[in-house]
Amino acid sequence: VYFNLIASDVKHSFWIPSAGGKMDTNTENINKFWLNFDSKRAEKAGEYFYGKCAELCGPSHALMDFKVKTKSREEFDQWIEEMKNAKAVADSDLAKQGEKLFQEKSCIGCHAVTPADKRPEEARTAPNLANFGERTRVAGILPHNEENIRNWLKDPEQYKPGNKMTKTYPELNDEELDALTEYLSGLKVETK
């Protein structure tokens, strides 16, 4: 797998220990490298390879973990096609309210909700949420459930100090939290 790495804020270091290799990410240029996720390593790693930031990058450095799930070449190609064609769809009335709030509160200014993010690179300042409803973690650290989604939206600073979401939107009331939680939970690509 080839990686093109660039940071949006400070220097980080992209590292997947069991796959080998790590690479710094800088704000001023793209660093490129590749890792081989062969079947033996994938079997040994289990369902996921675990990665983290290996550069002391700020107050939430210790919380910068991520997972890599391996797929066969055929499964990966199919996944890419699904990602290209996926569209965010709010199914329930509450989810539709959440979708509207996502626009009104300017969440969409930082977060994409479709896999094929066509915004300019400079606008991609926050994680793409296209498959948020399929993730196992909220903000990469909290178990993925409605209560934790609500808690994160209500006070992200409590869980990840120094994150970019804190104080970027007005305080949300309970109805808004319910609607946004419903909308975000419905953002799925693989399990629709």
Residue ranges and their predicted role:
Residues 90-115, 126-129:
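Sequence/structural segment immediately N-terminal to covalent heme-attachment motifs in c-type
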Residues 54-58, 110-117, 134, 154-156, ...:
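Detector for the c-type heme attachment site
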Residues 61-64, 123-132, 152-187:
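Axial heme c-ligation environment in periplasmic c-type cytochrome domains
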Residues 9-28, 66:
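Histidine- and aromatic-enriched segments that form or immediately flank copper-ligand environments
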Residues 26, 64-75, 112-150:
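Gly/Gly-Pro-rich "capping" loops immediately C-terminal to redox-active cysteine motifs
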